[in-house]
Amino acid sequence: MRLKVAVLGSTRGTALQGILDEVAAGTLDVELVLVASDKQTAPILERASNYGIRAKFVDPSGLKRETYDGIVTDALREAGAELVLLIGYMRIVSPQFVETWHGRLLNVHPSLLPAFAGLMNQRVHEAVLAAGVSETGCTIHQVTEEVDGGPIVLQKRCSVLPDDTPETLKNRVQALEQAAFVDVLRKWSA
């Protein structure tokens, strides 16, 4: 039986593309059962819909974090999710959500954790360049109550080039994120 995977995302969901491509090619044996977002116009929803994956907007307006996460958990359970991936998800999940999905909740962070933990999106790449480090990458980690502090599942690395900008670095790291999620899903679905 194929592993049933759901994705939560708030942005473009670039890292999802690698998974979609591999599933469509028949080279990754998982079933994407749901892609949900807290942003109604998040491109990740269209990306999923284009592949026939159920896409759902869950409106967080006026809801406490715990209430919202409970609604999301209901949607994930209804979809039959066994593993949840956070891909560009710009919300901090509640302790109850972490407990409910313990061991089955993975996040991607655009740096080599623990370096640059707690930063999001473009700010990470700006900080990497400002720090003058020679390499960066991405980290897939289990989600715990400590932001970006869960056990590391996989890291992929790339060099920081002298002429890098935050955007060029982000593009290279996003390519690593796609490959990293595919690698992790291959191991988890074996």
Kindly give the residue locations of the regions a language model identified.
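One-carbon transfer enzymes
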Residues: 1-190
